[in-house]
Amino acid sequence: MTICQFFLQGRCRFGDRCWNEHPGARGAGGARQPPPQQQPPSGNNRRGWNASSQRYSNVIQPSSFPKSTPWGGSRDQDKPPFGSFDSGASTSRGFGSSQNPFASPLSDEQKDEKKLLEGIVKDVEVWESSGQWMFSVYSPVRKKPNISGFTDISPEELRLEYHNFLTSNNLQSYLNSVQQLVSQWRNRINELKNLTMSTKGALLSDVKDGVSQAVPAFGFGSKQAGSFGSPGFPVNNSSSSTVQNFSFKTSPGLATPPSGSTSVFGSHPAFGAGPSAGSSISSSTPAFGLGKPEATSAASFSFKSPEASSFASPGFSGFPASMAASPSGSTTAPPLRSGSSVVGFGSPSPHSQAVFAKPSTDVFGGSGISTSVLASGAADNALFTPRDQLMKEELEQFQSQRFTLGKIPLKPPPVELLTV
């Protein structure tokens, strides 16, 4: 064992409790044995260094340190759990148990429910004061069922139903229905802002367990998508037969006007409805090529040299010419015909007529009667400008690879300068 250098110098403060060896002293070896009985030193050995008369034998002991220190104390010291601080009647350490040990604290589930209800109240207050769209659904928790009492109607659906009611000259029923929806929405908002015990229980049940959306509150109908004509929409069923058509149900056409009448736009809906008398749209199959196409094949899509090439030639556009000759005289934008290809390069329907040009050979082959993309209200009906009608500066701009800022021609280019 290592000899204590401080003992040799007479400065060891631990005496027999030293970990190092004290030569000549009883209990040497650093075993930290209990201190021997102190005896008064003899006259001849007052300044000696032995076990009975050590100068620093009763110095600071390790066990004499207090258990709790300002620096945190020892590791085995009793510490109260976090959150048990009692500001009213604290113990000597400043931490203690609650004043009422028999009071049962709120569980985590109850805290979550309280926080959820507070969030719902705050959301509906913001919804009401911000002026957001009323006819929408609301769920306070992600991927949870919507709270009952609200209906989902888009502005486009309301606009469509307005036109349907306008056609049937029954706008008063439309206004009454919308006003009733608004009043029901406000009543539901007020219920959520002023929650009662029964309302809280039903609300938590809706959010947690989920409710059957078959019979939502306020009679909005049995379907998730509310409809003005369905039993859920607040409309008097005996008012008119056209009110029953005020619905948002999915159909092959975007909507179907009342029987025996013409749609607001002079025809059936553009997206896939069937033809009717007085229709300004000559589409007989669903738009964008979803129906059975006409006899248009890839053989007509060729790069044969044109005889009188122009963009007004057949097949360049899939729009029928009836857009410029509707019964009302107005210009409407019909859908793409399914008889043409996606880009419109193909043989058009034989029922369409040319708007800008007489029948000629198609740019990419195939002949027939042309259809046009734009209406005939433009000042310049020609899609191309002959060379002799162009100024020198304009012709230079068309022949250059890039236009110069401020010198871009306002006329169409000559057909000779177009490359495919």
UniProtKB/Swiss-Prot annotation:
User: Positions of the zinc fingers (C3H1-type)?
Assistant: 1-25
* Protein's GO biological process: mRNA transport; nucleocytoplasmic transport; protein transport
**Where does this protein reside within or beyond the cell?**
Nucleus, Nuclear pore complex; Nucleus membrane
Chief site of localization? nucleus
Give the way it sits in the membrane. Answer: Peripheral membrane protein
Q: Where do the FG repeats start and stop?
A: 14-15, 82-83, 95-96, 218-219, 220-221, 228-229, 265-266, 271-272, 288-289, 345-346, 364-365
Question: Can you list the GO cellular component terms from the UniProt entry?
Answer: nuclear envelope; nuclear membrane; nuclear pore; photoreceptor outer segment
Write out the ranges of the annotated region (Interaction with GLE1). Answer: 365-420
What name has this protein been given in UniProt? Nucleoporin NUP42
Question: Where is the organism placed in the taxonomic lineage, from the top?
Answer: Eukaryota, Metazoa, Chordata, Craniata, Vertebrata
What is the name of the gene encoding this protein?
Answer: Nup42
